């Protein structure tokens, strides 16, 4: 059992009072309870809007407006919405358990018209956990939400996997999808269907018996039998067409002779003139073509000479440019040679200065050492001289002081004081407080010993310091060498750096030694590279002259080819004379042959026309006479076979027609007698009961009932028994089955179903095994399916029969054509084509003439080729020795490699030259760098301390010496004593002064000598430094000059530069000789061009004269050709045999045809006028216009439905074949198309009977319905009396009215309307046409009257009218009618939707408070029995124990209006009250 689809919920978003509210719908009844204005009608309006979003239909009015035709401007929808985006959606689960959300987006449109914009959409595949409000709104706060726009809704839904969103621009598409998914019960194809559905919903919503529905119950309940109407319309159209075609055939037969005569004479008249003009035009064109060929040849020769001129000019320009480049290169090479020579001289200077600089460097280093030693000695001598001077000065001062004291008496006291001071100074210096003048001498010995020790210690330290200074100077020297070579390095890394420098020194020396060999190798490779470049330039020039690129390895093969070409060209020149004589002889023979073939061509062309016509008609390639004879025999055999096959097809078609007639019987009765027997027995054919069985179930029921499927179902077999006694007109086997036709099922048999078969237990000892038929015929669907196949087969057989009949007649006519051909043309038809031979001979003649004309040109070309080949061989002789050089691809790489090696070697040589001496000095000092004498500073400090100690000891000893020396002053007691002592002292002082002066003199002399020597050394050093700096600066300048020269000055540079200059000089000489040669050739070419231009001007003048004549005639001829081709008559007019007739013969032929045509078109004014205009000989196009007018006239008279061509000539052929056959076939077809009035009556009667049975079945579902005093509701179906009479007359008395149905002037519909008027003369048909009335009479619905009846109280069955019923009874009765309509729609649409879909059923009822409790209970029961959902609205909860009830209360809070909703499930379900959901604002 298929589960019926259900509406799960209704969701309103942004409606008045409903921001986001979802109403869960009960499976049976959903009640909306609330006071006035609570929002019940708004909720229902939202549901209806989502169901039928058609603004032309929607009109939500109050029940007080029921029946009103006009309401408020917005029809009740605009005021129910709030500003912004609004939604109304329905959540549906169909029979396939698919969840579908269908709904609409509504939005108020600004303006005074209060319009609303509606956009329907669907969402499929949404998970059940997601509620509609979740996808329609977006939460933006704790108690706030935002309504999504339709685009945002689409984007959010499409982001979910497996969910589909679809928006509709058409309500039809929206309803089509809803029907396919089982949401609505009927396919709403048009606005009329939508209107019916809306009226149904509206009637349900407002309750009561809707007059809009009861008045048109036939449209709601009875399906339109469009198939029957269309069949009648197609049949009548076919009859009309058939009669028109027959009439056209009769007209066309009378035109056939006129076609033949008119086409034949018009063709002769126009074709003769057409071919005459064509011949004349060809003669003029041939003359023009001869001149044009000469003109084109001259132009070609001129173009060739101009091309040669351009090429030579270009080559001359290239040679001139190359000469300029070569002169520039030659000058550059000469300059380069001068630079190389200058650089060589510069290099010699540099080498000379470098040797001088090396010698100066060595001498400068030696002189530096000498100056350093002299400087040390000078410093010692200066120190000694200074000490001597100091000692002399001191002695002199002492002596001066003493003598001065002698002059003054107080000198003694001064000396005594000086002695005391000297004693105190000695005590302080010697730190001897106990020192006295007496013991001073003893202490003097002690301190002199100390001084001796300090001096010895100082000497030892000085020796050590000198050794350390030597080591330190070596380290510093080595370190400075490393820095000068490698740049700044740390002292700790000096040894490692020096070791690396010395390790790399041998390899750099080796590289430096390779400079000269590498220079020689590079010079050699560069010379080869230049030679290769020159060879490539020669190859490029050679390829340019040859016009083709060659590879070096191809040159030898090319040389052999050129040599063979030279030989061939020399031979071809010798053969030219003999070839010229042969061509002239052949040209004469061709002219004679062409004359012979021209005489034979017309006869052969006539035979070929006949042969090609035979080939086209027979479809065979007739290549010889034997094939013609064989083909004629095959035609006889084909005619016999085709005739036999045509008769077989006719028999098969008759059999199919009989089968179609049998299957077309109403109610599926294959035997028409069964219908009469069923009416006689008061039963129903079993096939009629199962008429609605589906195509899939037809094989099962066909096998189930077996032979009894053609039986009759009767209510009681005993009542039939007596009627069987005298029964004669019946089938051999008649099956009668007892059962109720209204509720018949297949339970009368015990059945076991097998694979594609059934076993039926007829009795205990009798079983029947029946297989499913391959082609079931049980049920209307199966019969219609079989009939469709039979109709297609019959159509194909009819087409095949027509084709075969045409082929038979065509074969007969073709046989006659073969007979005529054999008698007239067989002798010459299969000869060779003279025109083809003439064309070949003309082609050959043209070739020979062109060959003769081109002979000299070819000789000249051969001579040019000979010269070019010789030049090519000469160039190849120069190139071939250079092939190996051209193939050396590695030469440039090797030059680059050697260049890199030379650069590296030169860098090494420069390094050795710059740092070689330093590396030589550094090598023996490498070990010194391993250890840095770090104690040198400490030793210096010790030395300084020893010096201090020694100086202090000297000072102490000197102080003691002074005390000892002044010891006498301590004894000055008197003057005499003092003088004596002073005299001794004076002598000593003078003695010491003499010694000191002598020492000073020696020191001064020695200092002067050393100073002169030191000055001499410094002068030598300065001279050396000056010479060194001058030579170094000069060397830098020379090196910079060499760099500025930019030339590599090696041993072979000058030889290479000189060789390069000589090569360029030779190339320049060759180029100049070639340029002179080109200038001579260019002069000769210009003279030749002048001669050709004179000849060309003469040819152009002659050609333009003759071409002007051709062009003058061409304008009319082009118009003629355009008309001929545009109208497709070229094949008729261009008759090749006429091309061999002269102009007089063609004029005679045209004049004879003109006379015949004047008589033929005498009765046709248009053709007569056109013919008269065509007689103008100066306007040939008018003859073509006449021919086209004749064709157009005949083409317009061809019946395209009979003859399958628009060519009158072919039409004549087809007319004679088709006319007889079509006349016979169409007459037979008209007889078959004629409709039996009895069959029409049976079809309409059976259709009425089937619909009566269907309505009885619908009535059974309403038998138990009761509302108030109404105990039952039913639908009564009656046939109108006048229409019933018409059916009786059609079936029983049709012979009396055959004057209507056999008339060729009336269609069947018109005849039916005339019969209806004849039977009912009292009826006024108004202004309607008989055709319209007849079409209405073919619609079975117009035969029926439908009435709704109720069984009410004591009145019994009476017509249901609102005035006779209470409000509740009227509502219940109307609801029952609506349920019946919905059921009828579902049955009617069952074939259109999927088998696994059972559509949703839902109706509305507003203001349900008008029903009492019993009526409400009846509604609940009706919903439960019919699986229907119902939404009702009432001010109070009318049935809380069942269904789902929503309590609606409209409230206003802070100027915001909202509806408070509380849901309540029925008590019977024992489900707690649904929680109240606060409204989101």
Curated annotation (Swiss-Prot):
This is Chromosome partition protein MukB. Plays a central role in chromosome condensation, segregation and cell cycle progression. Functions as a homodimer, which is essential for chromosome partition. Involved in negative DNA supercoiling in vivo, and by this means organize and compact chromosomes. May achieve or facilitate chromosome segregation by condensation DNA from both sides of a centrally located replisome during cell division. It comes from Yersinia enterocolitica serotype O:8 / biotype 1B (strain NCTC 13174 / 8081). ATP binds at residues 34-41. It comes from the Bacteria. Keywords: ATP-binding, Cell cycle, Cell division, Chromosome partition, Coiled coil, Cytoplasm, DNA condensation, DNA-binding, Nucleotide-binding. The keyword Cell division applies. Residues 338-480, 509-604, 780-805, 835-1116, 1210-1265 form a coiled coil. Its main location: cytoplasm. Residues 666-783 are annotated as: Flexible hinge. One of its GO terms (molecular function) is DNA binding. It is found in: Cytoplasm, Nucleoid. The keyword Coiled coil applies. GO terms for biological process: cell division; chromosome condensation; chromosome segregation; DNA replication.
